[in-house]
Amino acid sequence: MVTVQMTLDRMKHTKCQDNSARQNLFSSLRQHVSHLEMADNTAQLSCDLPDLDAALSGGVRAGYPHLVCGHLHDGAATGFVLALLDKMIMQNPDAVFIWCAAPYAGLQGQLSARGIAAHGISPAHFIFIDEQHPMQLMAAFEQALQTKSVTAVIAEYGVMHQRPDLWQRWIRRFRRAARTSGAFGLLLGADAPAAGLETKWHITSSCYQQAPESSQWDEWPGLWDVELVSARGGRPYRNMLVWDRISRRFRHLPAQHQNSVPARHIYQSAASPAFSAQPVSA
């Protein structure tokens, strides 16, 4: 903080007409504040892949809200969030998650205990909050995000992002709440503005052009087109990633499947022999 105060003192004594010097000082101040914020990080969740972790400046940061977007009727975004939660359990076997959703908010139906167990996660880690009213749902997410004993809080926000004024107001509140508890905040839904959020992801299902070799996988693992749209202090990233439920790790798509395509192209071109593989989602 001494450096920040020294920079502010220098700005006071810089002549108004010397715009170049003032701009340099502002730039120096912004960089120093950014370094302080990054140093304030208490926990990061590695995504197993050096290139993705580098784009995230180390990993997914705890104590901040993150946005995970997907297409309607595509469970990939939900599957990606569950994969992140599974990795949190690897770090903390006693992890507790609060999942806030309205019946109409889900991208692909409602999450069930049986579905969570099928993903390889014990439902005992979850507390579910069902709330019909969108504003009450956001309030529940904020309150849960302030709870220090919670590892992560997830909210399926439905149509809340369609009100930009309310959306930005809630994002500011979520950011303060997450900083209070140090928990991961995960907002799950359709494409929404990312201002004020730590990261924005866009996750869609993809399809194998041929079945994975049995010697490599006993089943077809989730294959996702993962796009890191924005990351504070990081950079954009996009790649086809496989979620291996056995090792509980993200992996790059093997070379023999590099021609795999987004699942939506399969649906749009179902009659074409070039798109014959079955889609794999969450």
Language model features with spans:
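Conserved inter-motif catalytic segment of the P-loop NTP-binding fold
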Residues: 93-152, 156-162
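Localized chelating/binding microdomains
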Residues: 72-75, 90-93, 103, 117-118, ...
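Conserved RecA-like P-loop NTPase ATPase core
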Residues: 52, 68, 126, 153, ...
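C-terminal regions of RecA-like/P-loop NTPase motor modules
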Residues: 1-19, 24, 209-211, 232-282
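Detector for small/aliphatic-rich hydrophobic stretches
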Residues: 1-99, 119-124, 272-282
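Helical mechanochemical/support elements of P-loop NTPase systems and associated helical scaffolds
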Residues: 48, 77, 108, 137, ...
